[in-house]
C-alpha cells in the first residue's frame, strides 16, 4: 500500500526529513508544508555574513539589489538533492491544525493535506520584548530568525550606515555613529553585535542574566568572552532589564529601570565583573535587535493529544508521545494509528549519551541527526517493522563566529557542574583555548576557541567514550 507522509515545516529539519525518508526506502508521496515562502535555506549566515553582505560598501553601491529577497535567498538556499525532486513543497502556507485520528493537516489557506504519517518540523519563533514603546515596521525594533527578518534588519542598517557617510556628516553636524543595541547576549545576539560592530556601528549589548552565553559557557569563560568583545569596542550592560522603549513612531532609546538619562554615560569597556552600570537609564539607540530566545511552534497541535510541554515530547526513537490527559482514542490515533515523529528544535527527547531526561536541543547538528532517526522510525512504523529502542545517541555540535573568535561546542556543556580550562589563556581566546565540561566527574561537553579543524575529531571522540 502506498503511504503519504506529511512534513509540517520547511526548514532544515523538514528538508532533511524528506531526504532521509527517501534514504530509508519510503517510496510514497511526501508533502512538505512551510509557513515561509522560501525553499529551505541555511539560517546561521543570517546573523553573520548574509547580514553584512555588501553593507560595508553601502556608500559606494546604495542602489544595488543586495537587499532583494530573491538574491539573498540564492546565497543561503540549500541545494535540492535528486532524491527529493518529486517531493511536493507547499510554501507560504502555515499549518493551523492537525486531526491525527483522521490523518489530516489544516492549512491557513483553507486547504487540507491528508497523511498516513506525520513529521513535526515547525521549529521555533523568536520571543519579543513585551514592553511599551514603538513597534511594528519602521519602528527600529528587530528580531532575527527568518530570511525576511534579515532583509528588514539589513535595510535598516543600510539606512543608518548611509547616514553616517562623510557627506552626511558634512550636511548634519554632530551626527553620531549608528547606535545599535542588542538585547540578549546569547549566541545570536553576540553574532549580530559583532556584525554590527564590523560595519562601524556603536554597539551595546544589554543582558539581564549576566555575561554573554553564561548558561552554556559558565561564568569564567563567559566573562572572558565579554572582555574580548569589549577590547574590540563593544559595550555591555549586564544585570538590568528593559522596561520600555523611548520614542514615538521609532525607537530612540531603551528605558532601563528608574528612567535616569545615561546618554553621556556610555563608556566602552565596562568592568569585567559586570559591564557598564546603567540601572535606571535611558540608553540611546537608533536600532534595536531583540535576541531574547525563542519558543517552539506547536500551537497548531493543540488538542491533538500530544505532550506539548516545551516542544513535542518524544521517546528515543523520536516518536511523539501522548499527553497525560489524552483520551484512549486520541492516544491510539496519534501514536499507533497515524505515526507522528518530531525533528529539529521542536523535538524534546532523551539522549542516553547523557541521561534519560527529555530535552530540546537548539544546535545546528540536531535537524540532520534527528531527521535521520525520525525518518527511520516513521518508515519502520508505516511498514510494520521493529524499531531498536534507546539506540539514538547524537552528539550535539554547533559553532559561532564572533569577530575574530570562532567558538566550537561539542556535547552539552550546559549540563556541567564543573568547568576546566584544558589549554589556553582566558585573556587570549583568539590564540586558542579548550575548556572541558564535567558533571559528577564525567565529561559531558567541550568548548574550543580558534582551534584548528584537525583537533575537532579528538574532542568528539572523547565525548563518545
Model-based region annotation:
Residues 2-11, 174-186:
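Beta1/beta-strand and adjacent pyrophosphate-binding region of the FAD-binding site
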Residues 5, 75-179, 257-263, 267-269, ...:
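FAD-binding core/adjacent interface of flavoenzyme oxidoreductases
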Residues 8-27, 33-36, 44, 49, ...:
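Flexible, glycine-rich terminal cap/loop adjacent to redox cofactors
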Residues 11-15, 37, 124-126, 148, ...:
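Residue-level detector of alpha-helix initiation sites
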Residues 20-112, 218-235:
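N-terminal Rossmann-like dinucleotide/flavin-binding domain of flavoprotein oxidoreductases
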Residues 136-172, 265, 269-270, 274-276, ...:
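FAD-site-proximal beta/loop scaffold in flavoenzymes
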Residues 168-171, 177-179, 187-244, 394-399:
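Rossmann-like dinucleotide-binding cores of NAD(P)H-dependent redox enzymes
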Residues 348-454:
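Mid-to-C-terminal Rossmann-like scaffold of FAD/NAD(P)H-dependent oxidoreductases
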Amino acid at each position: 500500500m502506498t503511504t503519504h507522509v506529511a512534513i509540517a515545516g520547511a526548514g532544515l529539519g523538514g528538508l532533511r526529513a524528506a531526504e532521509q525518508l527517501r534514504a530509508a526506502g519510503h517510496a510514497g508521496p511526501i508533502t512538505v508544508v512551510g509557513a515561509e515562502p522560501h525553499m529551505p535555506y541555511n539560517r546561521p549566515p543570517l546573523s553573520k555574513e548574509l547580514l553584512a553582505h555588501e553593507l560595508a560598501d553601502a556608500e559606494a553601491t546604495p542602489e544595488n539589489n543586495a537587499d532583494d529577497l530573491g538574491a539573498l535567498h540564492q546565497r543561503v538556499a540549500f541545494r535540492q538533492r535528486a532524491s527529493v525532486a518529486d517531493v511536493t513543497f507547499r510554501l507560504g502556507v502555515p499549518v493551523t491544525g492537525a486531526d491525527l485520528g483522521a490523518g489530516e493537516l489544516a492549512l491557513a489557506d483553507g486547504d487540507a493535506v491528508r497523511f498516513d504519517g506525520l513529521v513535526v518540523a515547525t521549529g521555533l519563533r523568536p520571543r519579543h520584548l513585551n514592553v511599551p514603546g514603538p513597534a511594528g515596521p519602521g519602528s527600529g525594533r528587530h528580531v532575527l530568525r527568518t530570511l525576511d527578518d534579515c532583509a528588514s534588519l539589513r535595510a535598516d542598517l543600510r539606512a543608518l550606515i548611509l547616514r553616517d557617510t562623510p557627506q552626511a556628516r558634512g550636511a548634519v553636524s554632530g551626527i553620531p555613529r549608528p547606535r545599535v543595541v542588542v538585547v540578549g547576549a546569547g549566541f545570536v545576539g553576540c553574532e549580530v553585535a559583532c556584525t554590527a560592530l564590523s560595519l562601524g556601528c556603536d554597539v551595546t549589548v544589554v543582558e539581564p542574566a549576566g555575561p554573554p552565553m553564561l548558561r552554556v559557557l559558565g561564568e569564567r569563560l563567559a566573562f572572558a568572552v565579554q572582555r574580548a568583545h569589549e577590547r574590540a569596542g563593544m559595550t555591555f550592560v549586564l544585570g538590568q532589564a528593559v522596561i520600555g522603549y523611548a520614542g514615538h513612531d521609532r525607537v530612540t532609546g531603551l528605558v532601563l529601570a528608574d528612567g535616569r538619562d545615561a546618554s553621556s554615560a556610555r563608556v566602552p569597556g565596562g568592568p569585567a565583573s559586570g559591564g557598564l552600570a546603567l540601572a535606571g537609564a535611558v540608553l540611546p539607540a537608533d536600532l534595536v535587535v531583540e535576541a531574547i530566545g525563542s519558543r517552539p511552534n506547536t500551537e497548531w497541535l493543540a488538542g491533538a493529544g500530544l505532550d506539548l510541554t516545551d516542544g513535542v515530547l518524544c521517546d528515543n526513537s523520536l516518536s511523539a508521545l501522548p499527553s497525560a490527559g489524552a483520551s484512549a482514542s486520541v492516544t491510539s490515533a496519534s501514536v499507533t494509528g497515524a505515526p507522528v515523529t518530531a525533528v529539529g528544535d521542536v523535538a524534546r527527547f532523551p539522549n542516553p549519551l547523557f541521561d534519560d531526561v527529555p530535552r530540546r536541543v537548539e544546535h545546528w547538528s540536531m535537524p540532520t541527526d534527528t531527521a535521520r532517526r525520525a525518518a527511520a522510525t516513521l518508515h519502520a512504523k508505516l511498514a510494520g517493522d521493529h524499531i531498536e529502542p534507546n539506540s539514538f545517541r547524537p552528539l550535539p555540535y554547533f559553532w559561532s563566529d564572533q569577530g575574530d573568535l570562532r567558538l566550537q561546542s561539542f556535547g552539552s556543556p550546559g549540563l556541567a557542574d564543573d568547568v576546566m580550562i584544558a589549554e589556553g589563556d582566558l585573556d587570549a581566546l583568539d590564540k586558542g583555548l579548550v575548556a572541558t565540561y564535567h558533571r559528577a566527574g564525567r565529561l559531558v561537553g567541550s568548548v574550543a576557541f580558534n582551534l584548528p579543524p584537525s583537533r575537532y575529531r579528538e574532542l568528539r571522540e572523547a565525548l563518545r567514550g
